[in-house]
Regions:
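Positively charged n-region of N-terminal signal peptides that target proteins for export
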Residues: 1-4
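Bacterial N-terminal signal peptides
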Residues: 7-16
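Sec/Tat signal peptide C-region and signal peptidase I cleavage site
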Residues: 18-22
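Structured extracytoplasmic
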Residues: 23-180, 187-194, 198-213, 221-224, ...
């Protein structure tokens, strides 16, 4: 987010939000009561083997997602902490579809004029990049070389048993952004089911400041096979420092993105899952799913 009225040197901080469990440097968004206690016992399988297996499965998931259409509904609000009401809003509904040639594209379904300038900010290109891509973070053999991945332990989310990993970029290349945070990987399906962290770095160059809140993304199984994103939420207090005589300003921001109506697009490409051809419609979701929270009003 960029400040709409003044340019300032900025520092990011997480908004104080009630949490059932404590936060740390790798879980900037609070965890609800669905997250059980962490088991720090070393895994029976070497962590390197788990990482290799789940990143390979993430590549399969990423490729499968490219064969689905879905609807994305994004809402970005500024919150007046005195009244607890929304002071500005960006809202857009898009269908992620395929054009007649089979190329992936997006169609705007509904996009009223943004009122975020009422709250003192405006959307930046990296905000759109987060909504369209980064909140659906995947860790595959292609990009894992950019990250340090540390095994933390095992944890149950609702009824789903998960491996827990902390992820951070090894180095920051200019003009690139990276995920830093924690991921939960289903111990059976070996796919990421929850992501909690930031996209880093923020731009702190005077005159180009661009802040973003931490975020959390939940996935659920679609047609019994893949854990696709269904809900992302980001929330934080953006602290803008004074400059050129202007007063300091804090902006409370909340972002909610929903992903719905997944449908497999007709394709001649064979999609393999666990060595089996599942290109045709597979079974409906079964088993346990971690529950995403309901959006705040």
């Amino acid at each position: 987010m960029r400040n709409h009225w003044i340019t300032m040197l900025l520092v990011a901080a997480v908004c104080a939000v009630p949490a059932a469990r404590a936060q740390d440097s790798f879980t900037p968004m609070p965890l609800d009561a669905g997250f059980g206690p962490l088991d720090f016992t070393p895994p029976a399988i070497p962590a390197a083997k788990i990482i290799a297996d789940f990143t390979a499965q993430e590549a399969v998931y990423r490729d499968a997602l490219h064969h689905y259409t879905y609807r994305r509904t994004a809402r970005v609000d500024t919150i007046d902490d005195d009244t607890k009401k929304v002071s500005g809003e960006y809202y857009e509904v898009d269908d992620v579809i395929f054009d007649p040639s089979g190329a992936r594209t997006e169609k705007v379904v509904y996009a009223p004029p943004s009122t975020l300038d009422n709250g003192g900010i405006m959307m930046s290109p990296t905000d759109f990049q987060d909504i369209e891509h980064n909140y659906q973070f995947v860790l595959t053999p292609e990009n894992i070389g950019e990250y340090d991945v540390k095994y933390v332990g095992r944890q149950r989310i609702d009824q789903v048993d998960c491996y827990v990993f902390d992820v951070s970029p090894k180095m920051i290349e200019k003009h690139k952004r990276y995920f830093k945070g924690r991921i939960w990987v289903d111990t059976d399906e070996l796919e990421i089911v929850v992501t909690n962290g930031w996209m880093v770095p923020d731009d702190t160059k005077p005159g180009h400041e661009d802040l973003h809140p931490p975020f959390m993304t939940w996935r659920q199984q679609i047609d019994g096979h893949y854990w696709f994103p269904v809900y992302s939420v980001g929330e934080g207090m953006l602290h803008f420092s004074p400059q050129d005589g202007a007063m300091a300003e804090d902006v409370h921001i909340r972002e909610v993105v929903k992903y719905t109506d997944y449908k497999r697009f007709g394709t001649s490409t064979t999609i393999l899952y666990d060595g089996q051809d599942i290109t045709k419609n597979g079974p409906q979701p079964g088993g346990q799913q971690p529950g995403a929270p309901q959006p705040k009003k």
